[in-house]
């Protein structure tokens, strides 16, 4: 439909001006502002506004929120982006509201689960939401959160890197959906931002 979507940004934006310009929320704000009505605040506050979409950037320690579960159950779309805080978490496996179980630690150039150079993107599946999009030849990912292997991982994967590891995953929750970008929303882990 032509109506503007109400999109909520939930993140920690209590930073200096310089830090704000580098924050994932800054990138999301600039990308979304032309086509969406943006709401910002804490999770409980934005849920009261009944947004169409809630976006969280590198948030960890999400409470097991009945209000968020109910919002998803009624058709909400929760989009999460990974980042250094999530990668550093020792309780990543227990994090609620993710489409897949994540391995602790993430993977980056020079890290413990390392690859030698940044990875490009694999072609998008023809039946997925990114079908028909052209992948820039210089698009690379330097770090990501890895999904634990599971029998349904392939069907939850919307986009993957050239090595076959998931870049974007999705799972239904009630009438809603949870989507995870396994890399950051800013340029810290990828040049896709």
Where are these regions (language model features)?
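N-linked glycosylation sequons
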Residues: 1-193
